[in-house]
């Protein structure tokens, strides 16, 4: 029996800014954003849209009535939680109409949370092959206007349905995990924006990949030649490339070109969205599968997950025969192409708005599953 990703999709808010416009507004060379960090556009959301909004829209795109009857676990990986006690997964469970006899909860460990959820889902299905698990990575990455992290913001969600005999990616049992207590990125309770040690975070990311890769190679004997593509956590698209370049310098030029060509296919969507935190690796996986022209059934895909603080994991998936028939490339391209571009003034005004849940209010938004009202601090969603 194989277990893995049976369905996968993503959702981003209907607004974005162009990175050239942001660079000009911040008196920065546009090349620093387009080339230096590798970003072209950045997703932006109004206060009427939160992680539940994104999670519900992403999940709705992949779930059938039969899926909702088979799902007995709903997991949301996030570091943008809307409540200190109640899990967004509980609200998502109701909005999706999933059968009631299910577990629903959140997982937090920076950008790693959804990977923890995916592995937990895999283990659950191994024990209950007739059941399915909905795993959603949903986040809003915000660092503040005019901050160093401003060009690496973003928002959205990735939804994955984990099942036995998956139709897209079968997960292997070769995981290598790494935990280190490092303050490279953190957000103390009550702080609206994270604290970031940029140089340390970059260094820890690169070092973490090197450690789990070397340990994985030691345990399995697998090297780059055994992988048809690698997908990385992508806080910005140059980050994964830095870690990759540090490890492939001893490979032949042809091998380096092969590996980097697949990497470029994995970052196409992220260049247009920005940082999805927990969803970044899986947005990269979707981009790889929907844009790579050389992948085929049986190919081995290596996945590197990283969450600051810091937890990292490397694991492998094998592409299933006919996987291309279960992707949603046209839908995803339409989602990205039909967004509204905001001027920098509009973006700054939207960014400056805050949702005061202590004030009863109604909110106007045409997007399905957006917040319709706040009553006694409780959020109501359109559906």
UniProtKB/Swiss-Prot annotation:
Task: Give the record's pathway.
Answer: Metabolic intermediate biosynthesis; (R)-mevalonate biosynthesis; (R)-mevalonate from acetyl-CoA: step 2/3
One term of GO molecular function: hydroxymethylglutaryl-CoA synthase activity
Q: Which Pfam families match?
A: HMG_CoA_synt_C, HMG_CoA_synt_N
Q: What is reported on how temperature governs activity?
A: Optimum temperature is 37 degrees Celsius.
Task: Describe the pH profile of activity.
Answer: Optimum pH is about 9.8.
Q: Which reaction does it catalyse?
A: acetoacetyl-CoA + acetyl-CoA + H2O = (3S)-3-hydroxy-3-methylglutaryl-CoA + CoA + H(+)
User: What sort of enzyme, by top EC class, is this?
Assistant: transferase
- The EC number(s) given in the record are 2.3.3.10
Record entry for activity regulation: Is sensitive to feedback substrate inhibition by acetoacetyl-CoA. Is inactivated by hymeglusin, which also blocks the growth of E.faecalis, indicating the critical role that the mevalonate pathway plays in isoprenoid biosynthesis.
The GO biological-process annotations, alphabetized, read as:
acetyl-CoA metabolic process; isoprenoid biosynthetic process
Q: Which InterPro entries match?
A: HMG_CoA_synt_C_dom, HMG_CoA_synth_N, HMG_CoA_synthase_prok, Thiolase-like
| Alphabetized Gene3D superfamilies for the sequence | 3.40.47.10
Q: Which UniProt keywords apply?
A: Acyltransferase, Isoprene biosynthesis, Transferase
Which residues participate in (3S)-3-hydroxy-3-methylglutaryl-CoA binding? 29, 111, 152, 201, 233, 242, 275, 308
Q: Which residues form the active site?
A: 79 (proton donor/acceptor), 111 (acyl-thioester intermediate), 233 (proton donor/acceptor)
According to its UniProt entry, what is the function of this protein?
Catalyzes the condensation of acetyl-CoA with acetoacetyl-CoA to form 3-hydroxy-3-methylglutaryl-CoA (HMG-CoA). Functions in the mevalonate (MVA) pathway leading to isopentenyl diphosphate (IPP), a key precursor for the biosynthesis of isoprenoid compounds.
Similarity field: Belongs to the thiolase-like superfamily. HMG-CoA synthase family.
How does it associate, per the subunit comment? Homodimer.
Q: What is the protein named? A: Hydroxymethylglutaryl-CoA synthase
